[in-house]
Regions:
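A generic structural signal for short beta-strands and their flanking turns/coil linkers
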Residues: 2-4, 24-29, 56-60, 86-89
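N-terminal first-folded block
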Residues: 3-42
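Short acidic, glycine/proline-enriched helix-loop-strand junctions
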Residues: 37-58
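Short, low-order "capping/linker" segments at domain edges
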Residues: 42-47, 97-114
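Mid-chain, well-packed structural core segment of small domains
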Residues: 51-85
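C-terminal structural segments of small proteins and small subunits
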Residues: 77-106
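Conserved small/polar residues in nucleotide/adenosyl-binding loops
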Residues: 116-118
């Protein structure tokens, strides 16, 4: 299992969400985040200079089976990519185990909805 963390533009979130659902990703979490990066700019508004170095993004957290890592990356990259600086990053992190709290199931089976237990 792997945890995929992706930091993407807020403006691309809906497209990425649709791409993940089309790629049969059943569940993921997301958060609005702010970050600092090389895209720092000073902007002038009504004669006052503002530092806009804090960048708004969306952070996605997805845990998938090993066989689903590449399709998940492809879905995110395909939907999030604009070709401009600041499109984001995708991180792939090993996951040692997963436990479904309700049933105690562990491993891959704990990742996905099981109609047997509903």
């Amino acid at each position: 299992m792997k945890k995929i963390e992706a930091i993407i533009r807020k403006s691309r979130f809906e497209d990425v969400k649709k791409a993940l659902l089309a790629a049969d990703i059943e569940w993921f979490s997301y958060y609005n985040v702010r970050g600092e990066g090389k895209m720092r700019q000073a902007r002038i508004y009504r004669g006052v200079m503002y530092d806009t170095s804090s960048i708004e993004r969306v952070l996605l957290n997805i845990v998938v089976r090993d066989k689903n890592v590449e399709p998940t990356i492809a879905a995110i990259q395909g939907a999030a990519q604009t070709g401009e600086v600041g499109d984001g990053r995708i991180f792939v992190i090993p996951v040692l185990d997963t436990v479904r709290i309700r049933t105690g199931e562990r491993g891959d089976i704990a990742l996905y909805l099981s109609l047997i237990h509903i």
